[in-house]
């Protein structure tokens, strides 16, 4: 079916619902970066979180950057997601493996708290004009969902519920995604809507399992929580959107980055290496800059 975003509203337009599937994007990141299953899960969660945030931006070229700076062995992460559904990202320590921990449900789970440690979640919203909006909150527990909910509560003062999860089977990520439920700004003071949101979300015992059982049917996933969604409140075109891992790097951008170097640095590269190879942090694509191109940079 492929990764996607599905949007809906409920309670006569008072509650906004967004579900995202990031299974394929997570697996592509795993292949590109050589991620462990722990870091694949963490990056997949960050993909879901950033896409959920970007989904509400008013312009198609709007982007959200989600960065974690922390003292855990993961060594941080950075994700860039667009309103257009394109996402990319990387973690500081792609090969990280940790022992599983037992959950309250007597099951085993990745130790996200230990992986990320203590630190901060930084969110940048860029509409492509004016100054980007930046906000930083402390990490709650490193599972990304609660960290994102904390950001929404402290930075946007919007009653929200966030669910993010994944399921791994036979050495594959078989489902990865998230769900965001928000009381819309004009309705946020309505205590009945806030109570409705809280009550419906209490019914979710294991989002990862619910996501897997939905078999990629995100609308069905949403309806399990809010069966009375407003089908006609969002146009068919805006309701479902493709999501994919896609990087914005290019050879020209690599050349431009090289041109930022001091001429003495360029001369040093030319003498010692005779060429330069630039590797994109987001997707691991490699760009070779030959000696003639470096000489031209030095001349100019």
Curated annotation (Swiss-Prot):
Subcellular location: Cytoplasm
Top-level taxon in the UniProt lineage: Bacteria
Record PTM text: Under oxidizing conditions two disulfide bonds are formed involving the reactive cysteines. Under reducing conditions zinc is bound to the reactive cysteines and the protein is inactive.
The keyword Cytoplasm is annotated on this UniProt entry: yes
Keyword Zinc part of the UniProt annotation: yes
Annotated GO biological process: protein refolding
This protein's UniProt keywords: Chaperone, Cytoplasm, Disulfide bond, Redox-active center, Zinc
InterPro entries in UniProt: Heat_shock_Hsp33 (IPR000397), Heat_shock_Hsp33_C (IPR016154), Heat_shock_Hsp33_N (IPR016153)
GO molecular function terms noted in the UniProt entry: protein folding chaperone; unfolded protein binding
Disulfide bonds, paired cysteine numbers: 247-249, 280-283
Any one of the GO CC terms: cytoplasm
Function (record text): Redox regulated molecular chaperone. Protects both thermally unfolding and oxidatively damaged proteins from irreversible aggregation. Plays an important role in the bacterial defense system toward oxidative stress.
Family: Belongs to the HSP33 family.
Name of the molecule in the record: 33 kDa chaperonin
Organism: Prochlorococcus marinus subsp. pastoris (strain CCMP1986 / NIES-2087 / MED4)
